[in-house]
């Protein structure tokens, strides 16, 4: 085997080595091939180089031949009777591109078709040396693109370095015949520089014989003048590339179409213009006295110029062209002091001197291109030359030349009153600015000649351009249901500048309403397009170039993950799609209100001061009322019907329209106040709309008729869309309003039947007193309108689309009367129960009478509940959170209410510690019914029901922002506007001895404003009477309880807001049902009624704490009384005085699952104590937030939103908890997934709720075990004590009652169990363990036997379970 292995290894090694060798060979072959290819490429390159060298040699030979020919041509054409004029460049020959110093994109071939030239030519003019040919000049590009040739230089002013004696032959300018034979000398030395520049311009390989041959075709001076005239027209480049046609003058050969095709950047022609321009520049730069031998007669001391009919062809002025490298040609022309005097020809062919017609300068400021020229040529056309006629030219330089000076001022003919005299046409937009914006306003010669004129003009033009913003025409909105187009931006956008998060949210909100079938929207196609359409409306800032990047960064920023949700690219394969996690109405909600903390606190102080001055006047009642008319439907002000889009600056008209619609229902003295407030509201709306129009990017130019027409069409379309949306909105509102009325009527039908009798009795008793109070309240209301309305009329908008008012629970009828909104576009309806239909004239009075200044100030015709607001708003929170205590209200009304209670109150020693409700209609002390308290409790019940419906509707709410958490701390108000309350649980039924029933509803609201009154906690043991002489230690007990309660109340101030939100909205309602009804006419539906034969003068009832919003009903009997206005717990003690002269107190918790303590009283009425446990913060009815992490620290900048559990959700969770998680704490995966899908909860949230629920069960079991040990310990120590009324002395053990339907009957007349609440002082940071307490049981005997309290202080650390 080893041998086989060795053979295998050798074979494998050999195989591998062969593979390696093959690879190496292949690599070598490839390298060889590459080397061969490289060698071939090198050979090819060498061949190419050789060919190029040969070509260069051939070109050099050709150039030498051409030079030789050029040297021979002047000698061959040397004739004494002919003169040679400087000719234009090659017109029919092509010029190679590589031989020109100027880069040309195109080459044009020009033809000259005319008669042959008969003028004499001199051979000695163009004799050149080779040295002059090879000489180079550095000014290759400086003097190339001038505008016009001017042969003007006087010999008297010229300083020539070389002087030559020239004799020219005079020829007839018309016939071209030679007049005399004149011998000329060579002028080659004068023209050497000119010829060298000419060759450098036109190329070295040009045959100059062609020039001479071409010039032979020009027959006379007229054609020469035509050629020169064409050179002054830079636009004379036609479609056919012909300079001179066979027939007709030159000015008639070029149409306007040919001028329009003039290209400034591709002016690559080699025409007569360039040649003559070179000649003119050469003459001016080198100061030559003569350019070429002229066929004309030479005037003394002047350069001869060609003439046609006695008119000079060329004007007399010099061009000092300073061409910079940047192509900025600033030509400052200085006139010669001496003019050229040239006149018409006489009979002897001599000219008489005449002055020039015009004196003008060339102001050429060519900024961008070299093709911008001034058309200052005197000649209008060769055949039409008049002294009084200006030239005709056309300029098509629109964008490249800002200085097209076409208006030239003549010395002899300068009429400012005739603007049409100069027929120049300028297509540039700056022409009007250049001429001062008015026709005929031209500048003087001195301004044109000023060296600073062009700079000033350029500066003015640049300033005008910088001041004009770029015209951005927004795209019209294409969405049918657009909230922004219909209603404008939300109200919070006007209180503070909106952030980009707010802008993105409102954009996604409107997109969601317009396209509800789509969940995610693309950032560029949808979101940015929507923002672009409404940028000036919602952004309220300047449009920048990077605002789209800002939107992208905002949507993807981690700070706004709870607002915006990005679609997963893994699921659908798409990127850049965003949506909203939770949708709320930004026209109602306060989340977008980002005012500073200082401003909000200042507003709070102002509101509190007004409330103190006005005596708790409801802010809604002071707002102007509006009657039903055509412009209003269900209390909504349609402010967008004022056509503010069409009125740019007409705010007064809009105000008048709104005032007419808003002031129809103003009664008494409120008309002036309402008018002022409506003006404020309407001005705010209309100013915003007008700003949107004035800041629109469309610039209204007086001549832009198309833009104005387009804008008017857009406005008309928007107006039509708004009308259609308004009609649809009204129809939907009407339908929904009817549906809500039907539903609410069915829900409240039974409840109304129970309240009718109470309302009627209350009306009969307080009708007279209410009429007196109404007159006083009307005066207060009129005096306070200005103060209240000034803070709440700043924002008034119309309702958003597809969002309707969440009306509160109404009783019977909901009138279409409405109140002006505080900060939302909705005007909330008032829940009024009217008996008659005519309420137009009575509503205002009813609103005034519905103030809460006293318990008795209720509407005379019907039971009225407070107007409830359906949506959270900043001003609403101010209103609700700053209500004064109910105790303060009652204290202020005691003076007026004591007059009616004098007949019923028999005891003058009654002590009212804080506040007591009124006692009325109780005669003789027997069968007394507290009517005022009864009716008050009914009102509070209705208010709580309204709060339930109110808070259930506010489900989809934006998460908390940074500043929202400060509102709750500032107002010290525990009701959270984001909470969704849980409906009432099943009430527990207990049998309490015989014929004694109390149907009590506890409104245990926590009020931080009552902390000063907490020292007088439910300590009703401080009753000193003659019957208490047997209890020596009673006072000591009371002192001990007072100390504990004071400590507890002082220590609970830190955690009032976070811990006590559990006790609200009827979650902790305890109702007692009985087998027999009361004998009173109200039946068992009236709460807080005790029907006894005789009430003990010392009997007390443990009352619920009164809150700022829902004051609980409180009542007392004839004896001395003391109320508890402190912060009590959910469990309450019910006091019942039986016929058998024995009393029992049963304490139950809010859920009804267990009985905490039982207290029984004997018939001696010696000692009374209440049982009020403050340890129900751990009950099941609390929200589903986890116990520790649910409420974060106050220092946390980002507090989590409180999540609450609805009743239907709690049912699912309880079922799952009882079946799976209660015993072993384990889950069922399938059931857990099903539960998560049904509730739309995440698994982590369900886990937190279950853990919190299990922790509460542990705490409850521990509490029950402690109470059990305390109760048995008390019974064992008091086993020898018996009662005279009961044979049994055993106490039944307290077992937790987990079933709500179970009934227990407990009767222990032999013992008196009095519980003393010893609340532990918990100053820990744990917010959920604030009010835990341990029960202290005191056994009190009957008759005269003194007893000592048995204190069982079990210091069990319950906090360890939560930690």
Swiss-Prot record:
Keywords: Coiled coil, Developmental protein, DNA-binding, Homeobox, Nucleus. Residues 66-96, 120-177, 308-437, 621-731, 765-818, 857-911, 1001-1137, 1166-1202, 1270-1341 are annotated as: Disordered. Residues 1064-1078 have a biased composition (Basic and acidic residues). Residues 15-73, 738-789 form a coiled coil. SMART domains: HOX. Residues 132-147, 159-177, 315-326, 348-378, 394-408, 415-426, 641-693, 709-731, 770-793, 889-911, 1001-1031, 1045-1063, 1096-1116, 1123-1137, 1166-1177, 1275-1294, 1317-1334 have a biased composition (Low complexity). Residues 327-339 have a biased composition (Basic residues). Residues 73-96, 148-158, 379-393, 794-818, 857-883, 1081-1095, 1297-1316 have a biased composition (Polar residues). Residues 1179-1195 have a biased composition (Acidic residues). One of its GO terms (cellular component) is nucleus. PROSITE patterns: HOMEOBOX_2 (PS50071). It is found in: Nucleus. InterPro entries: HD (IPR001356), Homeodomain-like_sf (IPR009057). Residues 1198-1261 bind DNA. GO terms for molecular function: DNA binding; histone acetyltransferase activity. It comes from the Eukaryota. Putative transcription factor. This is Homeobox protein 13. It comes from Dictyostelium discoideum (Social amoeba). The gene is hbx13.
